[in-house]
Design a protein with these regions (language model features):
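Extracellular Ig-like/FN3 beta-sandwich strand-entry sites
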Residues: 19, 141, 194-198
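Short, acidic Ser/Thr/Gly-rich low-complexity loop/linker segments typical of extracellular
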Residues: 156-158, 166-187
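Short loop/turn and low-complexity linker motifs enriched in small/turn-promoting residues
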Residues: 1-37
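A short, solvent-exposed loop/turn motif at the edges and junctions
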Residues: 2-12, 191-214
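Divalent cation-coordinating acidic motifs and surrounding scaffolds
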Residues: 160, 170-178, 199-465
Length: 465
């Protein structure tokens, strides 16, 4: 029986291997060290995305891609050890099949934080992936960063920050994250001209509005502000899983289900003072043959409720590559009951294809990005097998627009079809559940009110380098 104080308890008979007992502990493992790859474990791999390229090709111009091979390093020295569960038969190209148990710890993944590789992202977006700006009509540009602290030097989280023109027209709004930083953009539409005038910011926090004049773009400086307010961050953390449940996801959905369930229960070990709430949105596509377009469960502190909802979902439908991503994001961003005040709001977007490309959908994606940023919802895409460069670009843009990070499944697990190598220089390979728990930790950690910020090399996915 798994029981957490204040939560529903649920009794299930499970078989637990010796090395899996730690999964049921509510404390961190004694050995908190991170295993690094042995010498010579770096691998390189590249893949093509011809099917998506054909689907998303513009009728006016042929999209050409310059192949950029990324080096990946396997972080875990040992092969992942899945928990017992139902086995999944995975077809092979030669007609054979292999069986893998759909337990947690099987899927492997990597992360590209484009805030941490800002110069490289500008080069990639302006060259290798430049054609995709027009395809999606999406290109976060004119970056402005605010660092907000109190007089003790502690970060102020969840303050609302508006970026405005001198006539008061709002260009963007965002909320400060757990490090006290807010990322704002002068434009998302690549056709929109960047303002040449001086801009200002308005900061709203606990009923008080403060103005910051003559703010500088990120290329020139990080804008800093100190408020005379007491320390007292919220202990609320909202996490939503938005999952593509079309037929093309079947090869990995059982494994993703196990990973999501594991992450939900491991959240209690991150910080016992935090109150996590979980919500879910599963989506397919639009059409009379679809069982549903979106199916959701609102936020709940009952962990088993979210686990049971996820476990009941199956992949089916779809057919064409584009899916109802915009409907799913709208359902999650605007119809889930996100906390009015929170330390962090995180949306994990799991998919293998982008939305339909029409002017209305393009405009809607930009609007949804701004709405998410304004509510402090950080989008963390997780791309699965079958993803192409067009979807990769859009997902990385969504992450930038909402102060998130881009993650992706890799071939190292042997699960699913071929996974696209991201356009970057290097990434580490981790088990997916460990990577996402690390993201949760990095988005929720804050120093205590009675201490100064430690001068340490913390493994946090900060928005600045």
């Amino acid at each position: 029986m798994v029981h957490y104080d204040g939560y529903e308890s649920e009794t299930r008979m499970v078989r637990v291997k010796a090395d899996e007992k730690v999964d049921f502990a509510v404390i961190e493992a004694k050995d908190g060290s991170k295993r690094r790859p042995a010498s010579g474990s770096a691998v390189t791999r590249s893949s093509s995305d011809a099917s998506e390229r054909a689907t998303y090709a513009s009728p006016r111009r042929e999209l050409k891609y310059v192949s950029t091979t990324a080096a990946s390093t396997v972080v875990s020295a040992d092969a992942p050890s899945p928990s017992d569960g139902e086995s999944t038969r995975i077809p092979l190209a030669d007609g054979g099949v292999i069986e893998k148990k759909a337990g947690h710890g099987v899927l492997t993944a990597g992360e590209v934080n484009d805030f941490a590789k800002w110069t490289q992202w500008q080069d990639i977006a302006g060259n290798t992936l430049s054609a995709l700006k027009d395809l999606w009509a999406m290109a976060p540009s004119g970056r402005y960063t605010l660092d907000l602290q109190n007089k003790s030097g502690l970060p102020i989280a969840d303050a609302v920050v508006h970026l405005k023109k001198k006539d008061g027209t709002e260009l963007y709004s965002a909320r400060t994250d757990n490090t006290g930083k807010a990322e704002l953009w002068a434009a998302l539409d690549p056709m929109a001209p960047l303002p040449k005038e001086r801009l200002f910011m308005e900061v709203e926090y606990r009923g008080r509005t403060t103005r910051v004049d003559n703010v500088k773009p990120f290329e020139r400086a990080v804008n800093r502000m100190v408020l005379d307010v007491p320390c007292g961050p919220s202990d609320l953390v909202d996490v939503a899983f938005v999952v593509d449940a079309t037929g093309s996801m079947q090869d990995e959905l059982d494994f993703l289900t196990a990973e999501m369930n594991d992450i939900i229960f491991r959240s209690k070990r991150i910080n016992d003072k935090l109150n996590f709430r979980f919500a879910n949105v599963f989506y397919r596509d639009i059409g009379s043959s679809e069982e549903y377009a979106t199916r959701s469960m609102d936020f709940s502190r009952v962990l088993s409720a979210s686990v049971n909802f996820i476990s009941d979902q199956r992949a089916d439908g779809g057919g064409d590559v584009p899916e109802a991503v915009d409907l799913a994001l709208d359902s999650a961003i605007n119809h889930l009951s996100w906390s009015a005040e929170a330390r962090a709001r995180i949306l994990f977007l799991i998919l293998d294809a982008g939305p339909h490309i029409t002017p209305d959908v393009q405009a809607k994606i930009r609007t949804l990005t701004k709405q998410a940023a304004g509510k402090g919802i950080r989008i963390v895409p997780i791309t699965a097998s079958g993803t192409g460069k067009a979807t990769e670009y859009l997902m990385r843009s969504l992450a930038l627009g909402t102060n998130g990070t881009y993650t992706f499944l890799t071939n190292h697990s042997g699960v699913g079809n071929s996974h696209l190598e991201p356009t970057t220089d290097h990434y580490d390979v981790e088990s997916l559940n460990d990577l996402l728990v690390r993201v949760l930790k990095s988005y929720t950690y804050m120093p205590g009110c009675d201490q100064q910020i430690p001068e340490l090399e913390l493994d946090y996915a900060d928005s600045l380098v």
